[in-house]
């Protein structure tokens, strides 16, 4: 392999790696957006669940089932 061929091969590899890095970076950014969105939804659902639990908890007696 001549030095020019070697240099060309290395340049091709670098270009492919840069493309892969850019693609992975885009995917990672989208995943972080999804994680952030889902975290916010989970927080809202947790708050809603706790509110509903507080509303119904006083009405539900804590007793052992009859088979105990």
Curated annotation (Swiss-Prot):
InterPro entries found in the cross-reference section = SlyX (IPR007236)
Q: What Gene3D superfamilies does this protein map onto?
A: 1.20.5.300
**Superkingdom of this entry's organism?**
Bacteria
Which PANTHER family does the entry link to?
A: PROTEIN SLYX (PTHR36508:SF1)
Under HAMAP family, the record lists: SlyX (MF_00715)
Would you identify the family this protein belongs to, as annotated? Belongs to the SlyX family.
The protein's name: Protein SlyX homolog
Q: Which organism is it from?
A: Brucella anthropi (strain ATCC 49188 / DSM 6882 / CCUG 24695 / JCM 21032 / LMG 3331 / NBRC 15819 / NCTC 12168 / Alc 37) (Ochrobactrum anthropi)
Q: Which gene encodes it?
A: slyX
């Amino acid at each position: 392999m001549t030095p020019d061929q070697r240099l060309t091969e290395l340049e091709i590899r670098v270009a492919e790696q840069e493309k892969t890095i850019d693609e992975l970076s885009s995917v990672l950014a989208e995943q972080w957006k999804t994680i952030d969105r889902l975290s916010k939804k989970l927080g809202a659902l947790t708050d809603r669940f706790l509110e509903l639990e507080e509303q119904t908890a006083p009405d539900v007696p804590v007793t052992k089932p009859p088979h105990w």
